[in-house]
Amino acid sequence: MKEKNQVVPDEVLSKEFLSRFKTEADVSKFLKQLHAQVLEKMLEGEMDAHLGYEKNSVTGNNSGNSRNGSYPKKIQTEHGESVISIPRDRNGQFEPIAVPKHESRGLSIEKLVISLYAKGMSVSDIEEEMREIYEIELSTSAISIITNKVNQAAQEWQNRPLDPVYLIVWMDGIVFKVRDNGKIINKTVYLCVGLKQNGLKEVLGMWVGKSESSSFWMGVLTDLKARGVQDILITCTDNLNGFTDTIRSIFPQSSTQICVVHQIRNSCKYVVYKDKKEFTADMKNIYNAPNKEVAATELDNLEKKWGGKYPYAILSWRNNWDDLTVFFQFPLEIRKIIYTTNLIENLNGKIRKYTKSKLSFPSDDAVKKTVYLSLMEIEKKWTQPIHNWGLIMNQFMLIFENRIQI
C-alpha cells in the first residue's frame, strides 16, 4: 500500500481553514504567499546567524553591526512571481544564501547545501546550520553525498574546451595544507586566468601539485593546448627558473612578462627594514619609466645608490632584465594589466576568503572541490570587460593583427 504523503498534520487542515479556498487559484495564491513568507523567515534566521544575535536583542548593542531595514526583491516560484523583503545589515556584509544576490529564484535544499559548502563551511557546520536556521534535518552522510556531486561538475569544468586564442594568460598558485599519506604537507593549487577577446576574464583550470617546477607547468600548458588553445599572445608569470623557456616550447610566439611585484618582493628580502621604504621608491622609478632605455638608466641609478650595500637585491634585476621589461613593448593601457599578477593575486585572496575556515584538507579532491566552488562564486561577478576595453582591444589588433581571430 502506498504511504500517504502527509506533509501537514490533519489538525492544521481543519474545515474552517479549508473553507477559505473555493478554487484552485485560491490555493495557488495561498501557496505563493506562504512560499514568500517562509523565505523571509529563512532570511531573518540567516541575518540572526550573521550578526550573532536575534532581532531586538540587547546583545546587539555596541556589537559593531546591526540590522538596517530591508529591500524588496522579485522572485520567481512555481506558483508565480512574488515580492519578498531581503534584510540588510548596516555594514553591508550580509550575503543571503536562501535567495542569493543577482538570482531570482530561491535555492533548493541541494543547492543550499552546496552554496554553504562554497562559503567554506564544513559538513558538520552545514548540518548544524540547516537544523538551527532552516529547521531542516539533514545527516552528515546526506550532506556528503550532495557535496560529492561537485567532483563530477569540477571534472567536467576542468576538461571543457577552451577558446583558440587568449590575449593574456596570468599564471600563479595558492598554497593549502593537505593530508598526504598520513602527513599534512603544503600543496599548491595552480591557476591560469585568461583574458578573452571580449574583454572578460575566465579561469582556464586548476592543477594540484606538491612543488612548483617548470616541468609541472609544462603539463599545465600541454593540457591547455589539448583543450583547444592554439595561441597565447602574452603570458604573465612569477620568476620561476626555466618558466619562460617552458612556455615558449608549447606556445612559441607568446611574449612572457615576469611579474614586477614578485621581483620587488624578492629584492626586498635582502633589504633591512629601515631602508625598505626608500629602496622600494627607487625601484618604482624603474617600472614607471616611459620606456626601456630610461628604465635601464634608473636601474643603473639604483645600483649606484644601493649596490654596495645590497648587491643581491640588484642582481636579480640584472639576471631577469629582458623578461622583466617585456611590458615596455606595449602601450600604457596594456602595460598596466601585464606587469603585475595583481589580477590573479586578487583572485587568490578571494579564494582565501571562502576557504579561511579550512585549516587543512583531507585529500587533493577535497581541495579541488572547495576551490572549484569558490571559483564558481567568484566568476559570477566577472560580468564586465576590463576597464578601457575598447581602446585596449584596438591596441591588441594593431600589434597582433595576424594572430587575433575576429
Language-model features: locations:
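Subset of Sec-pathway N-terminal targeting signals
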Residues: 1-69, 76-79
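Acidic/histidine-rich catalytic cores and adjacent linkers
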Residues: 3, 252, 285-406
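Short hinge/gating elements
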Residues: 20-33, 95-100, 107-111, 129-132, ...
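Electropositive nucleic-acid engagement tracts
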Residues: 54-57, 61-64, 121-168
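Basic, short loop/linker segments at the boundary and entry of helix-turn-helix/winged-helix-like folds
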Residues: 64-119, 135-145, 164
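RNase H-like nuclease fold core
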Residues: 87-90, 98-103, 136, 140, ...
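Conserved beta-strand -> loop -> alpha-helix junction used to position metal-binding or nucleic-acid-contacting
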Residues: 234-241, 246-284
